[in-house]
Curated annotation (Swiss-Prot):
One of the Pfam families matching this protein, by short name: tRNA_U5-meth_tr
Binding site for S-adenosyl-L-methionine: 276, 305, 310, 326, 353, 374
Name this polypeptide is given: 23S rRNA (uracil(1939)-C(5))-methyltransferase RlmD
Organism classification: Bacteria, Pseudomonadati, Pseudomonadota, Gammaproteobacteria, Legionellales
Residues binding [4Fe-4S] cluster: 77, 83, 86, 166
Annotated catalytic residues: 400 (nucleophile)
GO molecular function: 4 iron, 4 sulfur cluster binding; iron ion binding; RNA binding; rRNA (uridine-C5-)-methyltransferase activity
UniProt xrefs under HAMAP family: 23SrRNA_methyltr_RlmD
Record-linked SUPFAM superfamilies: Nucleic acid-binding proteins, S-adenosyl-L-methionine-dependent methyltransferases
Biological process, per Gene Ontology: rRNA base methylation
Keyword annotations from UniProtKB, A to Z: 4Fe-4S, Iron, Iron-sulfur, Metal-binding, Methyltransferase, rRNA processing, S-adenosyl-L-methionine, Transferase
Amino acid sequence: MRKVKPKLNLTSQTARIVNLSHDGRGIARINGKATFIQGALPGEVVEFQYTRVKKDFDEGKLLSIVEPSTLRVEPKCPHYQMCGGCSLQHMSAEEQIRFKQSHLLDLLSRYGHTAPQTVLSPLTSHPWNYRNKARLSTRFVEKKQSTMVGFRERNNPRFITEINQCPILNSKIDTDIVHLRKLIDTMEDKQCIAQIEVAAGDNEVALIFRNLTPLTEQDESKIRKFAQQFQYKVFLQPGGLDSVFCFYPSDAHAYLSYELPDYQITFQFHPNDFTQVNAELNRKMVKQAIQLMELKNSDIVLDLFCGLGNFSLPMAKHCSRVIGVEGNRNMVERAYMNAKSNHITNVDFYAANLDDVMEVRNLVNTSFSKVLIDPPRSGALEIVKQIDSIDPERIVYVSCNPITLARDTDILVNQKGYVLITAGVMDMFPHTAHVESIALFQKG
């Protein structure tokens, strides 16, 4: 018998918000079921309309605030209500931090079945113009005879929010979005550019144009003039990631750079490389991680998911030796390049399958007193399941997903004999629900 799909009640409803979901949506309890409403805050009475009805939960669209929360602030961005670039601008900066810290501790309790002995003070940065990496979608609209440049719409990712500014993006891009749109509007093939990747170093900003078809000579000339006038490095990507090349200046080397001034280290990176989005917060994060490691001159440290050496190189200045292991061979080459340019010789880097700890052990074949783990959103499940083969006395875990951190914490604490000494959030992405965190584990 075919299930009957519940009908949407399209009349406006009123509800009181009792909590926030992990992604920052307000939660109302109606007839024993959770209803998620984007843009609503705890304590508020809101008017909303159902947009989705499921067996276990419903979703609604916020229509108006009947009783506002004292935590509510006016969003800075004029595109905020539609744009999917961020989701918490309606919440005060202080409350955003409290929400993220509470979310982390709740997940550690619920899925990690533990709590840290102490909670770290949150790491924060300037909340605006912090985002040094982004992907902007573009689309030429025939009916309007104009180009849309922006992030995907929050409630309908098939569509692009046309933006004239973005207060979370690097300040140069924030200012120049309108000029980017004008550039594409003047091109002969206005459908050619599908997206624009933004990557900023400390002193330069690069744009990667994903061109679906070869550029005409006239369009190449227009892009060069744009890059020259507004001072950008421009890369083209005619195919896959391996096809990216520096288009302007033609004689420029392909790298951007950022500095960790506390350690007198400068990193060079390709615009396609993974680097932290928020430079100010990254500097604070590296410093905190090294403090938590409590490095001694005799320590040999293993840095897993080491990337281009963001933690490895500064740690190497405080210990005997650092071994960095990374799954991406290109990043291993970049890490060696950065070690050489910074005259750091007590580091080695290897490419390995980080789901196979025995491969890592056989590759490096040494003992480690301390380990730093900085995995992707999927976490470090295989690493923590096989941590006995490394047996470090201290682990610092840097996480970009509190759910997988909580899962891995459960294994480390309840199966492997480690103690969760401390943990806390690092607000790498202000005005979004994204939670970056750091945790210290000590062998019990």
